[in-house]
């Protein structure tokens, strides 16, 4: 659920959102290198979130406000036991038995060639062991933010600017699973009409963490809004910057199309390097089911992943279907 309440001729705003979901997921590790290597451990995740914020206008379209949030993520997982399995296969092969067929045989051959590491097959188990983090993590935040908003429509703008800077604090005394950590996010969106039915949209987003967050609270790349085409959280770290441009064109009555291109970086665990920049591009279809409210179908593409791993040789891609624009 989510909602926005506007009071006193748009001088005060109250926003809230929440969700509770149970879904299968995957964890690749923390840092660019972990995401690029492509070793993923399957998780069964229970997630509950609640967000609330209130802001008041200081002058014109400039607002300041306070925010709060609750995040819970619990993960169930099993080790694959690939290290022991590969060692057993090696012992059998050394004793004169044939290499197994199928996927396991291919992985054994890759291991012998130095292109597969069974010790990295369980990145979530490895992370929990090495970091001491809790797989069932609870986090509560308090925040302050400032924003400037001249958009004509908040959920599907055709002109205007939106800027928001927010600092959140996750104190241990509020029950956080990890010790104190902080988070700063910056959003800059720009919209402009071009020709008949065409809108140019630009988005810049930055997410920086101070301290060590819980495993599910790192800045995550991908998903429904930014860097579309990537599995959300495959690339995660303490610092993230993403940017994208999108052209939106209405073609006939309620029907429209879009195309976008974007790029992003995660770093902190690994050093910032320009050649670690990831890109995203794609196109989509829009159907305006109500005035200025669209159903969105997007197809996003990203980089090719680890060509050594059988499950990771295709280009990163995703179909996305939801209501409202990406930004």
Language-model features: locations:
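C-terminal soluble interaction/assembly domains
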Residues: 275-276, 280, 288
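Gram-negative/organellar outer-membrane beta-barrel architecture
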Residues: 1-138, 221, 234-237, 294-295, ...
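Outer-membrane beta-barrel domain signature, especially the mid-to-C-terminal portions
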Residues: 227-231, 272, 276, 310
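Repeated loop/turn-to-beta-strand initiation elements of outer-membrane beta-barrel proteins
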Residues: 10-14, 60-64, 153-155, 195-200, ...
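C-terminal outer-membrane beta-barrel translocator/porin domains of Gram-negative envelope proteins
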Residues: 126, 132, 139-147, 151-252, ...
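Short Gly/Pro-enriched loop/turn and capping motifs at secondary-structure junctions
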Residues: 252, 264-268, 290-292, 302-306
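Residues on the lipid-exposed face of transmembrane beta-strands in outer-membrane beta-barrel proteins
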Residues: 1-5, 50-56, 66-70, 144-148, ...
